[in-house]
Amino acid sequence: MAALVSRHTEHFATAPQIGPHDLVEIAAMGFKTVVNNRPDGEGGAEQPPNAEIEAAAKAAGLNYAYLPVISGQITEQQARDFAHLLATAPGPLLAFCRSGARSQNLYQLAGMVASSAPASRQ
């Protein structure tokens, strides 16, 4: 599993599809939050259901979020939701999808929407 993780920053990494059996190792690698960006059923019978991955993540002491996105169809709201997760979820954070590329694209879009957000009024 460690060889498949791509670290983008000290606080963020991506990975291809993980399974429930990977969560203990992910926790041992120091991650605090796991985000599933892959819609349930997208990969057919070989893809573990979100509920199984979430249960294994929680059993391993990890925070978990499900933010499914469709490749090539990421919305601005999904990018904003991901930016919120990045800002509020305990890190480091590991996001995954089928190959890791969709999670990386979502991360880049989240950075764009976060940097374009108007400053809060005081």
PLM features per residue range, with description:
Residues 1-94, 105-122:
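Cys-dependent protein tyrosine phosphatase-like superfamily
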Residues 97:
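Short cysteine clusters
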